[in-house]
């Protein structure tokens, strides 16, 4: 049975499988640094011990090997142990040269890395990003399950825009036109009418936005919740505690490994500050900006707010003009909505939704949209739709912001942006 490198120190005999990360040859001995997902270990291959020594002697870096041998607990290697091999099976020999180095100090440009992602992801500093992402998602799921949320999966091929915009990818659906879904928003709300009361979804979302920035993707993983008999304050509380639980799960399980790679994760101590959109505008104008009510925040304005609040903070009561048609109004100008920010970066957006049919139809019209395009959605509001609220987080952007990474493509396994459709 295969053993993992992390367990070798507790064993006397092992069978390890992994990649030959580095190779040194000295006459009748080959020293191999073998790597698997749990770590690295030195394997010493001697000509008198291994039948296919000549074949092993010629292997290239990143060849895939299966090694059987004894554990030398008195080794002078860096780890204090090494494997004295009695057999080495070459499972797959790597070609040379590699398209991208794994242990080389030379940094390749991002396009080269993404074009050879299967090599790029072998590096510890890249693997840890996705271990962190997986752990964050585990913490989010665990907390929402504990609160009694039901995980659901909604359609990703739809007949009309979720939010009424033009940023949709068209697809041919047999004889009809369809689109890749921007968001599960409308389906989450329909499930509130179905009596599910508390749902969450983790799934792909698609935006045909032409922005080509460090923060934009055209396909991303969206984490959405919707909750009945709740307002925007209720789901802000859920969001705050969800993020706290995710961060604690991350630190408890990967804290040392993250610190080793220079990732320092923000903690949430006490309540997250909440400021209104008007308060944010007033502060920015007192700092030299010239913003009017209804203006969105420029990157520079967001940076100034981030310098003031340092870590996490909510911006609440956004203008009606800046929110989708399903957002509940607080008054004629503002909505019961919020964004969660980490310094200058948006983490999450949410709101209380309109739950009365006539109000929703009027708001759809006020946004310049046709209610007939939303018949399947609107019908759910005619037969007992409860008050409800929710939010959505982009997993890749959450990972980027928490780890302090500058480009969201680095927190996406195989990014899809304005110019990239491969690999």
UniProtKB/Swiss-Prot annotation:
Pfam families: tRNA-synt_2, tRNA_anti-codon. Residues 185-188 are annotated as: Aspartate. HAMAP family: Asp_tRNA_synth_type2. It is an enzyme of class 6 (ligase). Belongs to the class-II aminoacyl-tRNA synthetase family. Type 2 subfamily. Mg(2+) 2 binds at residues 346, 349. This is Aspartate--tRNA(Asp) ligase. Binds 3 Mg(2+) cations per subunit. The strongest magnesium site (Mg1) is bound to the beta- and gamma-phosphates of ATP and four water molecules complete its coordination sphere. It is found in: Cytoplasm. It comes from Picrophilus torridus (strain ATCC 700027 / DSM 9790 / JCM 10055 / NBRC 100828 / KAW 2/3). Its cofactor is Mg(2+). Gene3D superfamilies: Bira Bifunctional Protein, Domain 2, Nucleic acid-binding proteins. Catalyzes the attachment of L-aspartate to tRNA(Asp) in a two-step reaction: L-aspartate is first activated by ATP to form Asp-AMP and then transferred to the acceptor end of tRNA(Asp). Its main location: cytoplasm. One of its GO terms (molecular function) is aspartate-tRNA ligase activity. The keyword Ligase applies. ATP binds at residues 207-209, 215-217, 346, 394-397. One of its GO terms (cellular component) is aminoacyl-tRNA synthetase multienzyme complex. The keyword Nucleotidyltransferase does not apply.
């Amino acid at each position: 049975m295969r053993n993992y490198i992390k367990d070798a120190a507790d064993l006397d005999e092992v069978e390890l499988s992994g990649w030959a990360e580095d190779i040194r040859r000295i006459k009748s001995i080959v020293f191999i640094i073998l790597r698997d997902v749990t770590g690295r270990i030195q394997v010493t291959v001697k000509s008198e011990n291994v039948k296919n020594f000549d074949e092993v002697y010629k292997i290239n870096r990143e060849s895939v090997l299966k090694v059987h041998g004894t554990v030398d607990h008195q080794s002078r290697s860096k780890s204090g142990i090494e494997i004295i091999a009695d057999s080495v099976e070459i499972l797959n020999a790597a070609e040379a040269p590699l398209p991208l180095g794994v242990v080389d100090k030379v940094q390749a440009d991002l396009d080269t890395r993404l074009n050879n992602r299967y090599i790029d992801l072998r590096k510890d500093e890249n693997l840890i990003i996705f271990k962190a992402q997986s752990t964050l998602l585990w913490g989010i799921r665990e907390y929402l399950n504990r609160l009694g949320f039901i995980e659901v999966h909604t359609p990703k091929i739809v007949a009309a825009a979720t939010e009424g915009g033009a940023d949709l990818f068209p697809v041919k659906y047999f004889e009809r036109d369809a689109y890749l879904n921007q968001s599960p928003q409308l389906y989450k709300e329909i499930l509130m009418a179905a009596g599910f009361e508390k749902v969450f979804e983790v799934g792909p979302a698609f935006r045909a936005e032409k922005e080509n920035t460090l923060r934009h993707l055209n396909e991303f993983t969206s984490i959405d919740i919707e909750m009945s008999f709740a307002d925007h304050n209720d789901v802000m509380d859920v969001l705050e505690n969800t993020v706290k639980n995710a961060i604690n799960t991350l630190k408890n399980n990967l804290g040392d490994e993250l610190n080793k790679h220079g990732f320092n994760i923000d903690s949430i101590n006490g309540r997250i500050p909440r400021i209104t959109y008007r308060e944010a505008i007033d502060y920015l104008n007192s700092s030299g900006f010239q913003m009017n009510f209804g203006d969105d925040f420029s990157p520079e304005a967001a940076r100034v707010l981030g310098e003031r609040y340092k870590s996490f903070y909510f911006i609440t009561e956004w203008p009606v003009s800046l929110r989708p048609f399903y957002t509940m109004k607080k008054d004629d100008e503002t909505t019961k909505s919020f964004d969660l920010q980490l310094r200058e970066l948006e983490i999450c957006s949410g709101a209380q939704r309109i739950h009365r049919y006539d109000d929703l139809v009027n708001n759809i019209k006020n946004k310049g949209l046709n209610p007939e395009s939303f018949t399947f959605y609107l019908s759910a509001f005619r037969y007992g739709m409860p008050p409800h609220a929710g939010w959505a987080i982009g997993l890749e952007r959450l990972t980027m912001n928490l780890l302090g990474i500058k480009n969201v493509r680095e927190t996406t396994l195989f990014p899809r942006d304005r110019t990239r459709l491969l690999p």
